[in-house]
Amino acid sequence: PDPQKRLFISQEVCEGCGDCSTQSNCLSVVPKETPLGRKRGIDQSACNKDYSCVEGFCPSFVTVHGGGVKRAGMTEVPMELLQAIPAPKFPSVDHDWSVLIAGVGGTGVVTIGAVLGMAAHLENKGAAVFDMTGVSQKNGAVYSHLKIIEDPDTMSSADVGLGEADLLLGCDLVASVAPVAVRTIDPNRTRVVVNETLTATPQFQSSPNMNLEGGLLLKGLQDHSGVNQVSSVAATRIALSLTGDTIGANTFMIGYALQLGGLPLSVESVERAIELNGVAVQFNIHAFRLGRLAASNPDAL
């Protein structure tokens, strides 16, 4: 059962020493930039509740028993805006459509590949999915290779090879610039859609003052694929603000990429695939629509 106990860090008391990271080696302890310098916070969406971060006996920790995390409302964006989203661009497809989804374990990267594969199936297209989880666990790099095929009888390997990606869907910026992802980019073919919110890496646990600026990583993607081929959005920040949970960021990214013409799938088939997945259906459909809205009318958010 889920323990009815949560830990929080008081920003007013935290001195930013990073001992909580040292004690726990947990990536759910995240940096919080404030006018008084870098503090620490706990990503409640990712916390696995082993409570090791409190072992440093830091006075900034607050333990809450029996309470839940207050979620932001899902009605902050007017419904008429979501209903007025124009039809997405539809890519011209004359070959198998290759997608590489890059992210971190525990955030639903593999699920995204499965949902998009199901959406293709609902349109009577072929779909092949190949997940690369390797030895990664939660917060390790995960890649899902997806090929959408007009004629299922011509289906071949799902692996997205050198320069074969039509879409690099970067749910995590660090995972997106890894060699295994960059090798799939062809400047004349690949559209890159990436979450620009930088997630702290394991190095942050031992180097609490490390530079967490993602601009150089984003520039690296632009250098490989061309500035005009890269679209970035602060998906994690927007998802947290509008849905109350960072886990909505990846579904948000699907909507964002679809609206920009990165996926040869219909809105209806993707939403139906989310329904068939059967997990937090309304939450994920809402996040998907927010992603579409961010691509078509960013000022609305």
Question: What are the residue ranges of the model-derived segments?
Answer:
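Residues forming the flavin
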Residues: 1-7, 12, 31, 82-85, ...
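Charge-patterned, long linear interaction tracts outside catalytic cores
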Residues: 2-21, 282-292
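Active-site lining segments that contact anionic ligands and/or coordinate catalytic metals
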Residues: 4, 21-23, 37-39, 50, ...
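A short, structure-level motif marking secondary-structure boundaries and short turns
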Residues: 7, 29, 100-102
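Aromatic-flanked redox-active Cys/Sec active sites in thiol-based oxidoreductases
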Residues: 11, 44, 104
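Short conserved micro-motifs on helix faces and helix-strand junctions that flank
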Residues: 15, 102-103
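Iron-sulfur cluster-binding cysteine motifs and their immediate structural context
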Residues: 15-41, 46-72
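Active-site cofactor/cluster-binding pocket
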Residues: 63-101, 107-301
